[in-house]
Swiss-Prot record:
InterPro entries: Mopterin_synth/thiamin_S_b, RnfH, RnfH_sf
Native source species: Erwinia tasmaniensis (strain DSM 17950 / CFBP 7177 / CIP 109463 / NCPPB 4357 / Et1/99)
Name the UniProt record assigns to this protein: Protein RnfH
A Pfam family it matches: Ub-RnfH
Domain of life assignment: Bacteria
Family: Belongs to the UPF0125 (RnfH) family.
Length: 95
């Protein structure tokens, strides 16, 4: 099968990682991430814990990638979005 070109991205507050990778057609999201070498560079990434997506759409590790896809590895949330909204609303009400 021919190779397809995809991107694998992972963003931290201080640095963004973007790798252009060629993988065989029919490869899974997990195979694409492994082929990028990002797991060796950032050992804190745990594919069983971190969610993944393609163009901001959540996908499973076994889903197939297509040419031109951008595979994204998401970091876990550090705060509950509902709590943050509540805190912002309280601060705005005090002003």
């Amino acid at each position: 099968m021919p190779d397809i070109a995809i991107e694998v991205v992972y963003a931290l507050p201080e640095k963004q990682y973007l790798y252009n990778v060629k993988v065989p057609q029919g490869s899974s999201v997990e195979q694409a991430i492994i082929a990028s070498g990002l797991l060796q560079l950032r050992p804190e990434i745990d594919l069983q814990e971190n969610k993944v997506g393609i163009f901001s759409r959540p996908v499973k590790l076994h889903d197939e990638v297509n040419g031109g896809d951008r595979v994204e590895i998401y970091r876990p949330l550090i705060a509950d979005p509902k709590d943050l909204r509540r805190q912002r609303a309280e601060r705005a009400a005090k002003k």
